[in-house]
């Protein structure tokens, strides 16, 4: 069965309560459940992972090698700071989709640069939590080979 890995980075465990005027009321658990149902509808296995620690995220990316077809990642603040995360994603040679709930380009200037975007297969910003749905749909229809 094809497989996706959904990774959420720092502070995304606070979805639903952290700055709801920016991120909405949907919790991370809601996002993961919705994503699992949607992936299942496409016949895709979905694994989820969230950490506030860069090294743990890098370790999880490394462990995906050989059994994950596509990574969907909302790297949170690591987007703008982590060369290590970029190197991990490039190093495992697994295509990935970068997702951001808010439009990072309409926010503070330090959020405008991503260390990942030039290596991502697709980038979804500013769609709210619908961005996760769109990423799964794109992966299912355009990135995963059906056997």
Curated annotation (Swiss-Prot):
PROSITE patterns for this protein: DEHYDROQUINASE_II
Gene Ontology terms describing biological process: 3,4-dihydroxybenzoate biosynthetic process; quinate catabolic process
InterPro entries xref list: DHquinase_II, DHquinase_II_CS, DHquinase_II_sf
Keyword list, A-Z: Lyase, Quinate metabolism
GO function term, MF aspect, one: 3-dehydroquinate dehydratase activity
Binding annotation for substrate: 74, 80, 87, 101-102, 111
Keyword set includes Lyase: yes
Pathway: Aromatic compound metabolism; 3,4-dihydroxybenzoate biosynthesis; 3,4-dihydroxybenzoate from 3-dehydroquinate: step 1/2
Keyword Mitochondrion: no
Superkingdom, natural source: Eukaryota
Record's catalysed reaction(s): 3-dehydroquinate = 3-dehydroshikimate + H2O
Site residues, Transition state stabilizer: 18
Family to which the UniProt record says this protein belongs: Belongs to the type-II 3-dehydroquinase family.
HAMAP family in the record: AroQ
Subunit structure: Homododecamer. Adopts a ring-like structure, composed of an arrangement of two hexameric rings stacked on top of one another.
Function summary: Is involved in the catabolism of quinate. Allows the utilization of quinate as carbon source via the beta-ketoadipate pathway.
Protein name (Swiss-Prot/TrEMBL): Catabolic 3-dehydroquinase 2
């Amino acid at each position: 069965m094809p497989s996706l890995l959904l990774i959420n980075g720092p502070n995304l465990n606070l979805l639903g309560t952290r700055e709801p005027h920016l991120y909405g009321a949907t919790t991370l658990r809601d996002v993961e459940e919705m994503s699992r149902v949607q992936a299942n509808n496409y016949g895709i296995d979905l694994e989820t992972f969230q950490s506030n620690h860069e090294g743990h995220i890098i370790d999880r990316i490394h462990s995906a090698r050989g059994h994950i077809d596509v990574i969907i990642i909302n790297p949170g603040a690591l987007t703008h700071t982590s060369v290590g995360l970029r190197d991990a994603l490039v190093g495992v040679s697994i295509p990935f989709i970068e997702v951001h709930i808010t439009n990072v380009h309409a926010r503070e200037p330090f959020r405008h640069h991503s260390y990942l975007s030039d290596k991502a297969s697709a980038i979804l910003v500013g769609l709210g939590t619908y961005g996760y749905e769109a990423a799964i749909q794109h992966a299912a229809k355009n990135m995963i080979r059906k056997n």
